């Protein structure tokens, strides 16, 4: 049985008019009768395309400032009518079958994103007739084609040309899925927006913004790839991306070469890229198991890479490397000759670097583009039976935010190193301790249940690589609950400590720093990372 359905009549009503004139003309050229509404009908008529206004077809005018246009039995009967089953009813009531619906919805998200948007503005951009037509057509995909995305116009015309002006059930079903995804996302945005509002009628108010967190959490993601497995080989996995991902992210990066990214590759690349974004100077971040194992600045990225690698060459093996400048030939050569690496990501990659990396065919090379804004949005963590949702940790301090609490003031060089390793500590799993000197990590202690043991591990790692801890700055992602961490740091040769402060025993910790002649800086900001 042939499941193709010819397209003889289409209803077109779009807010986003990208490509709609060309698409409507293509349909008209193939003998399709076009129904349309409002601004879409006027645009098509101005372009010389024959159009029947929906109000002329239904005999019922658009009304209430356009709020009621398509909500009529002659429209929805034409869309929902089952061919071969409802034909007699449709004929009795003068309902013509509508074979294709081309609709996208009022720009609700764009409206509420505008500065100064009021609740009244938002309400007027809630589409009613559009979603109803979309859902009707998608429900009746056995007989009707629904098109909600401009990027599908060319595909539809091509299939009509290849299939005697008809579309297959397979295509109609695929387009119906896209339609339901479209309306689900749209309703989710509206629910999220209204979920942050608490009605406060009176005093000319219709709502007050109460919370950035809605009563229900709706967010839609599109599957970008299926994976061989997840974090472990017995776990199935896929990678989903937001509808409009942030610029310069692992989600939007272009893969130039290499094997498909794994679950762990993506997680680690994200950690490396977000860390390297913190620095204005040429920087390199090497990540292993979601923790920076080497971070450094340099005159150029080759120097930055060389210094970052020296922090912990053992852990750097099989790691992820991120840069905040273009990957050049010299740096690509140094990496490929020195170590095995899973992923390299940079804002751009020179043609010479691409050619050099090509010799390592499995190495994943990503180009993410430049970044001009900070990553925004929410962090979401799954727990059994629920989600933890919070702002992303964008907190960072400048020199003006720092408070020196010790008797000894930090030197200019110590202050510079303190700010450097404070940025690194933000991306190390708690409990996090970072030793640094001269814009280079000297030792990283990550993920220990005891802060003093993280400090000991940072020292051990530095010693293993022959790096001098004497004179280093130490950053701690959270306060020291006891003086033992300071005593251990002093024994290792640390001369300056940067930490949030806020412990009940701050006085004891500061006294320990003074006893050891150390400078101590409070940031007033914690950076737990779990």
Curated annotation (Swiss-Prot):
GO cellular component, one term: cytosol
Database matches in SUPFAM superfamilies: Cytidine deaminase-like (SSF53927), Methylglyoxal synthase-like (SSF52335)
Biological process annotations from GO: 'de novo' IMP biosynthetic process
Pfam family, one: MGS
EC identifiers of the protein: 2.1.2.3, 3.5.4.10
Highest taxon above the source species: Bacteria
GO MF terms, alphabetically ordered: IMP cyclohydrolase activity; phosphoribosylaminoimidazolecarboxamide formyltransferase activity
Residues that span the membrane, as ranges: none
InterPro entries from the UniProt entry: AICAR_Tfase_dup_dom_sf (IPR024051), Cytidine_deaminase-like (IPR016193), MGS-like_dom (IPR011607), MGS-like_dom_sf (IPR036914), PurH-like (IPR002695)
Domain MGS-like: residue ranges: 1-148
Pathway(s) it belongs to: Purine metabolism; IMP biosynthesis via de novo pathway; 5-formamido-1-(5-phospho-D-ribosyl)imidazole-4-carboxamide from 5-amino-1-(5-phospho-D-ribosyl)imidazole-4-carboxamide (10-formyl THF route): step 1/1; Purine metabolism; IMP biosynthesis via de novo pathway; IMP from 5-formamido-1-(5-phospho-D-ribosyl)imidazole-4-carboxamide: step 1/1
Catalytic activity: (6R)-10-formyltetrahydrofolate + 5-amino-1-(5-phospho-beta-D-ribosyl)imidazole-4-carboxamide = 5-formamido-1-(5-phospho-D-ribosyl)imidazole-4-carboxamide + (6S)-5,6,7,8-tetrahydrofolate; IMP + H2O = 5-formamido-1-(5-phospho-D-ribosyl)imidazole-4-carboxamide
Keywords: Hydrolase, Multifunctional enzyme, Purine biosynthesis, Transferase
Comment, domains: The IMP cyclohydrolase activity resides in the N-terminal region.
Entry's family note: Belongs to the PurH family.
Name of the protein in its database record: Bifunctional purine biosynthesis protein PurH
């Amino acid at each position: 049985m042939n499941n193709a359905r010819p397209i003889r009549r289409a209803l077109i009503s779009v807010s986003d008019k990208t490509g709609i004139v060309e698409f409507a003309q293509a349909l008209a050229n193939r003998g399709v009768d076009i129904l349309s509404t409002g601004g879409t009908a006027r645009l098509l008529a101005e372009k010389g395309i024959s159009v029947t206004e929906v109000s002329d077809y239904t005999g019922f005018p658009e009304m209430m400032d356009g709020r009621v246009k398509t909500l009529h039995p002659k429209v929805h009967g034409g869309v929902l009518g089952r061919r071969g089953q409802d034909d007699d009813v449709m004929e009795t009531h003068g309902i013509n079958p509508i074979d294709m619906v081309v609709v996208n919805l009022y720009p609700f998200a764009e409206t509420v994103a505008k500065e100064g948007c009021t609740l009244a503005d938002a309400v007027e951009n809630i589409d009613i007739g559009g979603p109803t037509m979309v859902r009707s057509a998608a429900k009746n995909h056995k007989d009707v084609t629904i098109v909600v995305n401009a990027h599908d116009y060319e595909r539809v015309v091509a299939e009509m040309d290849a299939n005697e002006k008809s579309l297959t059930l397979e295509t109609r079903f695929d387009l119906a899925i896209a339609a339901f995804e479209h309306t689900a996302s749209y309703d989710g945005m509206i629910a999220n927006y209204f979920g942050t509002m608490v009605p406060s009628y009176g005093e000319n108010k219709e709502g007050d913004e109460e919370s950035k967190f809605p009563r229900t959490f709706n967010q839609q993601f599109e599957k970008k790839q299926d994976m061989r497995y997840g974090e472990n080989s017995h776990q199935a996995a896929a990678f989903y991306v937001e509808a409009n991902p942030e610029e310069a992210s692992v989600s939007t990066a272009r893969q130039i070469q290499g094997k498909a990214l794994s679950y762990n590759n993506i997680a680690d690349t994200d950690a490396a890229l977000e860390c390297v974004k913190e620095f204005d100077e040429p920087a390199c971040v090497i990540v292993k198991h979601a923790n920076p194992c080497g971070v450094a600045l340099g005159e150029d990225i080759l120097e930055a890479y060389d210094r970052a690698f020296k922090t912990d060459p053992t852990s750097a093996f099989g790691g992820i490397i991120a840069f905040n400048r273009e990957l050049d030939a010299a740096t690509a050569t140094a990496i490929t000759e020195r170590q095995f690496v899973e992923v390299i990501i940079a804002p751009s990659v020179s043609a010479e670097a691409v050619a050099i990396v090509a010799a390592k065919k499995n190495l994943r090379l990503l180009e993410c583009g430049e970044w001009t804004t900070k990553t925004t949005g929410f962090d979401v963590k799954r727990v059994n039976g629920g989600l933890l949702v919070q702002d992303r940790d964008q907190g960072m301090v400048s020199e003006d935010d720092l408070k020196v609490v010790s008797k000894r003031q930090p030197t200019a060089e110590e202050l510079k190193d303190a700010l450097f390793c404070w940025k690194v500590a933000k991306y190390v799993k708690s409990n996090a301790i970072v030793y640094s000197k001269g814009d280079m990590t000297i030792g990283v202690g990550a993920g220990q249940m005891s802060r003093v043991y993280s400090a000991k591990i940072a020292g051990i790692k530095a010693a293993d690589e022959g790096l001098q801890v004497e004179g280093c700055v130490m950053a701690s992602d959270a306060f020291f609950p006891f003086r033992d961490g300071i005593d251990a740091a002093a024994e290792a040769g640390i001369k300056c400590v940067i930490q949030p402060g806020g412990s009940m025993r701050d006085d004891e910790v500061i006294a320990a720093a003074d006893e050891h002649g150390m400078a101590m800086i409070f940031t007033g900001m914690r950076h737990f990372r779990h």
